[in-house]
Amino acid sequence: MTTQVPPSALLPLNPEQLARLQAATTDLTPTQLAWVSGYFWGVLNQQPAALAATPAPAAEMPGITIISASQTGNARRVAEALRDDLLAAKLNVKLVNAGDYKFKQIASEKLLIVVTSTQGEGEPPEEAVALHKFLFSKKAPKLENTAFAVFSLGDSSYEFFCQSGKDFDSKLAELGGERLLDRVDADVEYQAAASEWRARVVDALKSRAPVAAPSQSVATGAVNEIHTSPYSKDAPLVASLSVNQKITGRNSEKDVRHIEIDLGDSGLRYQPGDALGVWYQNDPALVKELVELLWLKGDEPVTVEGKTLPLNEALQWHFELTVNTANIVENYATLTRSETLLPLVGDKAKLQHYAATTPIVDMVRFSPAQLDAEALINLLRPLTPRLYSIASSQAEVENEVHVTVGVVRYDVEGRARAGGASSFLADRVEEEGEVRVFIEHNDNFRLPANPETPVIMIGPGTGIAPFRAFMQQRAADEAPGKNWLFFGNPHFTEDFLYQVEWQRYVKDGVLTRIDLAWSRDQKEKVYVQDKLREQGAELWRWINDGAHIYVCGDANRMAKDVEQALLEVIAEFGGMDIEAADEFLSELRVERRYQRDVY
């Protein structure tokens, strides 16, 4: 199958102009980027940039505030599209990241729109945690003069589907806010629901907010979105895989790969803290197994996004086969009248458990049925790209991007199963083979602007990836700030990822301290949170010296355990109770001194 990438000729800038723009903006702060956006708008309209960046007086019109709370970029894209719709309707709108929002201003909001995703076990995105805590605290103000709407993005394969949006919606109403529209909960395939919701929001707001004068129809407080590139999630770069190296030992229970991808002369840029989006193909053997279990041939024509494709091709390129969901189980049970699965229908907990423990192909194996090709396609979810924390800095690797991939492998009744994207990169892409990629920028996981600022990095397992990028950048910048790494894994001899590199950084004085937790090398299990408590006094000194704290890895257990350890350290060595420690950590988050990249 040939992947079509938009030719550069379609861009309004030639390659040289695009390169100059990228070079000029790559190290600007979000605030500076927002100002530059207003400046260019002012130049275009022959008005001073200051006017373009100044909100209209509140007395003249009630402004609309859109809060974007995004984890992987989808919520941000919906918020940006809504902002553009409202500007087209000549309404005065302000778009802001939840992490930049001064939440004490919420009492003065008249028209408030929240677009949010959900992470972990129903938690809000990292950039919205402080706002979420504030609204659920005793400090939250009454909002009787606020009308609001919430669009919630989620993944129905998780138990706490769209929980963050549900939280914001219920709390805003509880505080006295008036719902402009009922909340919308959108699944992975959110685009159609988002488009319909945006149109309804515009219609609802037209009757609430007077039309702005031309000079006032400008987005203020812009979300961090100015990343100039012809490549995106919907138009990925076709790059080539240059290195696929296993970096765990022969006897390790884990298969972790160091992957290097050659970006060629694409000009694709990224920063430490960003993620690499990977569009993968399903395993042809898995496709064949599923098709045969359903008594199909694979050459049946099916319709995908208005195009007719053979079933095998559609399944390999366009549909999710490695993640089951409660909805899929329920729909399959209803379609096939399976005696095994029908008793689960209506019991959310049992459906979730079955979906989490039984891949789609094994669900079909255990409850065989005959479906036609279109029925199968309608049962499945669209394939979505996987995001991997980038493990390199272009200050060192230039036109490459590195990722650290934990390959998902397991057995179901003796049959080997694997994760879709991780096995694609590890097993099915040959050297110099094509990989479709894009950069998902993450402005909520950034090194300090001041190179003298100390950095504390906590990243067990593959959570170490962005800190490799951080250290490459700090070394290239000759940053004088101290660096401290906490890393953990089961065994020292088998699972010390990038061991030689960390040892070199210590020897060269770039890595000031390193604390290692090997959970299976002794009778008593030791994790990174235990090392945090053990080093509590020194950790508190670093925090008092202005250190930034970064956490990367598992959201469900590790991140919570690490946060609890940090709270205990702050309470003990800061001489405060847990409630005060929680306030202290929340302040660090607001100040961007406590940042997490968890999944």
UniProtKB/Swiss-Prot annotation:
One Pfam family it belongs to = Flavodoxin_1
Instruction: Enumerate the spans annotated as FAD-binding FR-type domain.
Output: 234-448
Write the protein's name. Answer: Sulfite reductase [NADPH] flavoprotein alpha-component
The family annotation for this protein states: Belongs to the NADPH-dependent sulphite reductase flavoprotein subunit CysJ family.
For this protein, what does the record note about how its cofactor is bound?
A: Binds 1 FAD per subunit.
Q: Name one GO biological process term.
A: cysteine biosynthetic process
Q: What is the catalytic activity of this protein? A: hydrogen sulfide + 3 NADP(+) + 3 H2O = sulfite + 3 NADPH + 4 H(+)
Q: Provide a GO CC annotation, any one.
A: cytosol
Designated gene of the protein:
cysJ
Pathway listed for it is: Sulfur metabolism; hydrogen sulfide biosynthesis; hydrogen sulfide from sulfite (NADPH route): step 1/1
Function, as annotated, reads: Component of the sulfite reductase complex that catalyzes the 6-electron reduction of sulfite to sulfide. This is one of several activities required for the biosynthesis of L-cysteine from sulfate. The flavoprotein component catalyzes the electron flow from NADPH -> FAD -> FMN to the hemoprotein component.
Organism, as annotated: Shigella boydii serotype 4 (strain Sb227)
Binding positions for NADP(+)? S519, R520, K525, V526, Y527, V528, Q529, D561
In terms of Gene3D superfamilies, this protein maps to: 3.40.50.360, NADPH-cytochrome p450 Reductase, Chain A, domain 3 (1.20.990.10), Nucleotide-binding domain of ferredoxin-NADP reductase (FNR) module (3.40.50.80), Translation factors (2.40.30.10)
User: Taxonomically, what lineage is the organism?
Assistant: Bacteria, Pseudomonadati, Pseudomonadota, Gammaproteobacteria, Enterobacterales
